[in-house]
């Protein structure tokens, strides 16, 4: 059958193309994925930080990093995930990183995102992926906390490893008397996605921006649980009041203070008794403040 479109089909396709933005090649792209109405979704969950939600967000980030082409770094805080995408030709690892922001490759040009850099299709795919995976991991995390075991037919092999590695830690931190609250939210979380190009030098600044927002959100959420009147008070004032109550914010786990990231690391693995190197996505819940550790960030994205 001929693929040639009729006049009607051509006209309909023109309507679609009018809004189908195409990203240029060889440019850094930021993907921002946000939960829909998460203040309502998490209304009856543990406050100020819910371990089940945090677990699902962190592992959703890792899944997206591993399954979206050209992803170099992931960062999550609250109900959002930020991904840094760029092609391998954008940077030359042999160069001194001081020159990193002025190197402009011209030898080859690769697609930055799927679907030939089409923003509309990529955004819909990324939002769908986040929604699917978060709901899956949210359910697994709830089972880790409230159930002694999970049916083998309900969990994939890689999820079994996740179960074994995290169930004891989750059970230690999470209140275990409200299982039905979580069951009521199974398969109901949704996410949106947006993408935008940034200059190379602003890759790091975008993550700094999101991390600074994470710190503000963390202080505010923590303070609202213990201080009656937080209106008009800045972060330093809230921290001082929390300290007077014996609840210093800066003693919270680092991931609750300023988020969690994901990046690739070389790990030594063994096959038939012989070691070999392999890149693996790892979750870092003790990431530093990027603004004060820019070299650390550059090392991770390269």
Predicted regions and their residues:
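Regulatory and interdomain segments flanking nucleotide-handling catalytic cores
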Residues: 1-302
